[in-house]
Amino acid sequence: MARTTPIERYRNIGIMAHIDAGKTTTTERILFYTGVSHKIGEVHEGTAVMDWMAQEQERGITITSAATTCFWKGMDGQRAEHRINIIDTPGHVDFTIEVERSLRVLDGAMAVFCAVGGVQPQSETVWRQANKYKVPRIAFVNKMDRQGANFKRVVDQIATKLRGNPVPVQLPIGEEDHFSGVIDLMKMKSINWDDALQGTRFTEEDIPPALQADAEAARHFMVEAIADADEDVMMKYLEGEEISIAELQAALRKATISGAVVPVLCGSAFKNKGVQAALDAVLDYLPSPVDIKPVEGTNPDNGEEIVRFADDSEPFSALAFKIATDPFVGQLTFFRVYSGVLTAGSTVLNPGRNQKERIGRVLQMHANERHEIKEVLAGDIAAAVGLKTAYTGDTLCDLNKPIALEQMEFPEPVIHVAVEPKTKADQEKMGIALGKLAQEDPSFRVRTDQESGQTIISGMGELHLEIIVDRMKREFGVEATVGAPQVAYRETIRKTVESEGKFVRQSGGRGQYGHVWLRLEPLEPGSGFVFENGVVGGTVPKEFINPTEKGVEEALENGIIAGFPVVDVKVTIFDGSYHDVDSSEAAFKIAGSMGFKAGAAKANPVLLEPIFAVEVVTPEEYMGDIIGDINSRRGMMQGMEDEAGAKLIRCEVPLAEMFGYATTVRSLSQGRATYTMQFEKYMEVPGHVAEAIVKKSQR
């Protein structure tokens, strides 16, 4: 099948934002204007096309990032047709993992900001994630029609809070109730959309005289910013020569793709104004798959570095970025094709698991509608049905030209709850349901508690686990009773020690003998566990090093003080001895475990707890009560700011003290304060609190 759209006219973009910035409404308008959906879906009516899970329509928030393909010929309908693949990403902090995995496979993003709320805590998180993956972006300041809308303030916040380099390419005509359209600073024209036709038609007119001076100043700023990023434009600018719109747009495109500049647009998605021009900006300023550097990976056979270009003639390579269970076709694996072509019915390699996979059917998704296609090409985003071994973050590639793309990193869960099915008959169904949900979501874990036999589920926050339990009921028909949330404590050591682990057992016949000397050292927070072999002269043979490490790992899992996993520790085996007959892998595994436990007990072991960054926005009159309450929760104040007629309080609070905070903050402020919280770091638990936790764990 020949390509209908050249790859240069592809745009793989994400829409990223804070929870109430109007991101899903913006996506709905994009789908409407590009002709995919004929009736606009409204979030507040629960009909939005992208929010296709029942819980999303009830809660009005986007949980899973649905992938959608649409086509655009420009606002005036005169351009060559471009293909835009959009990933809608959730804005709630418990779902940052969804955002992270979407950004990994995108080429560009549209960051949506609320003209009233501006840069919110979640905007900062998502922006940092986009920086990590070097995703070029444009900004769309939405909700310009709302009370309190202020375009300039949001632009300033993008510069100060996000440390971006925002360059407005539009100005709003009016704000709040008076918002009627935008000024295009490239053409120096005002654009007005026809309300009666839901914004599908527009007129270009002269700039209103009252705004002419502002527009000229803003254009001057825009041209200077572009000149700063582009030598050719700078030369013309300094010489006082005329710079054409085409030259300015080409230079701004280059600066956006390099990450030097963020073009800023504005509008009101709800009022059908501005999204059409933002789509033009996606074409003008965001990269196609060939504008960004080719994808890099390694040869799984020899570790050599390999590069794959975004070209149909290259060997096939793709990254699975999401697993979803569809009620009609079963398991769907969403993947982004970086190079080559994949045909339905062909077999590919999953190098990370060394498994071959047959691709049954390939589907292109429009929210939760599916269209079966015969093949996917470089730059495409699609979903495959029936893959057995692929998990989120796995590479899929050509059998004969293998490549392993860089793995995705997923955060460790910070909160646990015990779940039990309401009826014994549901026990097995619950196991299957949780297994499927864990395969879809790498930040969600399931395990069985060895002592109590309870099923423990872990995730990134209370809402995350609530939605998992809700999905079990809706999608798998399993009702569960949920225990009180438990904090995921960790343990670590504070000083370097050396310790001996010796396991000798003699009871007639062959004995057991394992003997090791270990050095335990504390590591920087977030380093995890490192094991090194420092044995010289063969005092411990090579075949017993691995079992020793396994023994240490088992001891790590069971903790030192209160049974919580030990982190940020380096263990080096540097000496020991063995017996020709009696030594075995099992004996060295036990010796490793004994050596670690003995050493850790002497190495100043401490408890660590997850600390959350909390931001509360409250009317000033409730500030004293809210700060007092934060202090009573062992909170540490980080600062305060004025925020649109209210106060923004920034603090860090242990997760253990935050359960039920939503109710408290509502009652303290008569429902007028709002808060967000997200995991920040692990810190040592104060002595008196640690004692209580240890006592509780020993019961």
Curated annotation (Swiss-Prot):
Single Gene Ontology BP annotation: ribosome disassembly
Chain coiled-coil ranges: none
Cell compartment(s), UniProt: Cytoplasm
Residues covered by the tr-type G domain: 8-290
Superkingdom, taxonomy of origin: Bacteria
InterPro entries found in the cross-reference section: EF-G-like_DII, EFG_II, EFG_III, EFG_III/V, EFG_IV, EFG_V, EFG_V-like, G_TR_CS
A Pfam entry, by short name: EFG_C
Keywords of this entry: Cytoplasm, Elongation factor, GTP-binding, Nucleotide-binding, Protein biosynthesis
GO MF annotation terms: GTP binding; GTPase activity; translation elongation factor activity
Gene Ontology cellular component terms for the protein in this record: cytoplasm
Binding-site list for GTP: 17-24, 88-92, 142-145
Entry annotated with the keyword Nucleotide-binding: yes
Predominant place of localization: cytoplasm
HAMAP family membership: EF_G_EF_2_B
PANTHER family assigned to the protein according to its UniProt record, in alphabetical order: RIBOSOME-RELEASING FACTOR 2, MITOCHONDRIAL (PTHR43261:SF1), TRANSLATION ELONGATION FACTOR G-RELATED (PTHR43261)
Function: Catalyzes the GTP-dependent ribosomal translocation step during translation elongation. During this step, the ribosome changes from the pre-translocational (PRE) to the post-translocational (POST) state as the newly formed A-site-bound peptidyl-tRNA and P-site-bound deacylated tRNA move to the P and E sites, respectively. Catalyzes the coordinated movement of the two tRNA molecules, the mRNA and conformational changes in the ribosome.
Assigned protein family: Belongs to the TRAFAC class translation factor GTPase superfamily. Classic translation factor GTPase family. EF-G/EF-2 subfamily.
Protein name, as recorded: Elongation factor G
Taxonomic placement: Bacteria, Pseudomonadati, Pseudomonadota, Acidithiobacillia, Acidithiobacillales
